Design a protein with these regions (language model features):
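Active-site/ligand-binding-proximal alpha/beta "capping" segment
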Residues: 205-269, 361-367
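Active-site-proximal loop->helix
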Residues: 150-194, 198-205, 290-293, 412-420
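Short glycine/serine/threonine-rich phosphate/pyrophosphate-binding segments
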Residues: 123-128, 140-160, 175-177, 223, ...
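N-terminal juxtadomain amphipathic helix
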Residues: 1-83
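Claisen-condensing/thiolase-fold acyl-transfer catalytic domains that form or cleave C-C bonds
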Residues: 357-413
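A short, small-residue-rich loop immediately preceding and capping a beta-strand
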Residues: 129, 133-156, 162-170, 241-254, ...
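Positively charged, low-complexity intrinsically disordered leader regions
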Residues: 62-137
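Active-site/ligand-binding loops adjacent to catalytic centers
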Residues: 194-211, 264-373, 418-459
Length: 459
């Protein structure tokens, strides 16, 4: 049993067979990790080992940007791993936007996950999650989603034909770009009266009662796949870690998986330097920011303060606070991976910040002008970087990697409202959320249907 599941609570620490299916630890209710007996596995002596697979095209799994790192997530045989070509993403040096963030040239990099098959980072995790589903013989799978998870699950089920997908979404809480993907790929779509947090609660209940294989990031195998985003970042930087990884924070699956990646790489002696981690909430969905920076909730060696969390949620419910942000992918008030994220922040000496809708949209416009258009949630990473540089937390010459989680076609309304000239549309999409200026907008220009007028304009 070289791969198994382990409860993250050190006071429990119970282990479970690889082929058992649990949403959380049956004994104490804590989250589960996928763990390995590394001393019994053929671990590479150096990360340079993976360079041998850069040009591999004949073996689909080695072409995958997830499974070519199979030795670092070896819970399934390579030939059993599910892939639809995910992980062909790039780390782009971003001198064009570094001044906006307050960084010197050569310091800022953008990890663009919008090149994945469904257009977001979720495909990294879905490749691993559906692989475990295949191992346990799942035929029906489900998720709750703000949009990207549903699109990813739907495309994997549609392409592989292994499982039927059911997705739960909140009423009016999903961008049409993402919803269209799930519908087009054939997923059964259940729209409930509520938001993502409500949908997440209902999908867990339905999964238990109907034996649906749950593929939210509560599933520890999802997070195994998302570790590979960090492997590709290191690969692009010639295996030298950056000073900072900055990532948007929603359900906290990415930040949790990044932390696990660095914990394991360090334990295996494959890296010495551990990057610092910054997780960026939207101000309208800032549970992690409030708990970490204000309430001072910490990992504390795995002995996190349950009472602080429960008290926070009780007060949130009493006040009727609901997540609300244009960055729909991170519009979440009850992040299921909260405790794993605390572990990542602890190991990576991390910080948490919140950014406003205005800061997100301005950052998004600055990313877009360089050709790497992103959805609003992605831009939270750049907005957070700008804030941390202004605070002096990030040095102007430190090497920073911002994770762009999804492409701009995921939520075109925000883009059109920001850059367009329709004041009524702007107000309905952005103005009501506190966005007042469009300093970096690329407004379309209206001109008469006359070639001379067009020529004069272009001159």
């Amino acid at each position: 049993m070289t791969a198994f599941q382990r409860c993250i609570n050190p006071d429990c620490g119970h282990t479970f067979d690889l082929l058992e299916v649990h949403h959380s630890c049956p004994d104490c209710g804590s989250l589960l990790d996928v763990d390995y007996e590394w001393d019994k596995l053929p671990v590479p002596k150096s990360l340079n080992f993976f360079e041998d697979f850069w040009g591999c095209r004949r073996i689909p799994q080695r072409f995958s940007g997830v499974w070519r790192f199979h030795e670092l997530l070896p819970f399934a045989k390579l030939e059993d791993c599910v892939t639809i070509g995910e992980g062909q993403t790039i780390l782009q040096k971003a001198d064009f936007v570094a001044p906006y963030a307050g960084l010197k040239a050569g310091s800022l990099f953008l990890q663009y996950e919008g090149l994945n098959p469904s257009g977001s980072f979720k495909d990294n995790g879905m490749a691993a999650g559906t692989t475990h589903g295949k191992l346990v013989g799942a035929r029906h799978t489900a998720c709750a989603s703000t949009g990207n998870t549903s699109a990813s699950l739907a495309i994997y089920c549609g392409v592989t034909r292994m499982m039927n997908a059911v997705i739960f979404i909140g009423s009016g809480k999903i961008a049409y770009g993402k919803l269209s993907q799930a519908l087009d790929y054939g997923a059964k779509t259940i729209q409930i009266e509520g938001d993502f947090d409500d949908a997440m609660a209902r999908v867990q209940e339905a999964s238990k009662r109907l034996n649906l294989y749950l593929l939210n990031s509560l599933n520890p195998f999802r997070l195994e796949g998302q570790k590979t985003i960090m492997f590709r970042v290191l690969e692009a930087l010639r295996w030298e870690g950056p000073d900072w990884i900055v990532v948007p924070g929603g359900n906290l699956g990415n930040s949790s998986s990044f932390g696990k990646a660095f914990i394991e790489l360090h334990k295996l002696g494959l890296i010495k330097k551990v990057p610092r981690l910054a997780v960026i909430n939207a101000a309208g969905a800032d549970t992690l920011y409030r708990l970490y920076e204000q309430v001072k909730l910490r990992w504390n060696g795995g002995h996190w303060d349950h009472d602080k969390i429960q008290k926070f949620y009780d007060q949130m419910d009493a006040e009727g606070r609901r997540a609300s942000t244009i960055a729909s992918a991170i519009e979440i008030n009850r992040p299921v991976n909260l405790t794993k994220c605390l572990r990542a922040l602890d190991f990576c000496n991390g910080v948490v910040r919140e950014v406003t809708e205005q800061e997100i949209l301005d950052a998004k416009a600055n990313v877009g002008v360089g050709g790497l258009g992103c959805e609003p949630a992605s831009a939270a990473s750049l907005a957070g970087t700008k804030k941390l540089v202004a605070e002096g937390v990030i040095g102007k010459d430190e090497r920073v990697v911002c994770i762009l989680t999804g492409n701009q076609l995921k939520d075109p309304n925000a883009t059109v409202a920001y850059h367009g000239n329709n004041k009524e549309f702007f107000e309905s999409v952005l103005g009501k959320r506190g966005v007042t200026t469009t300093e970096f907008a690329n407004h379309p220009i209206t001109v008469a249907n006359d070639i001379e007028a067009i020529i004069r304009l272009l001159k």
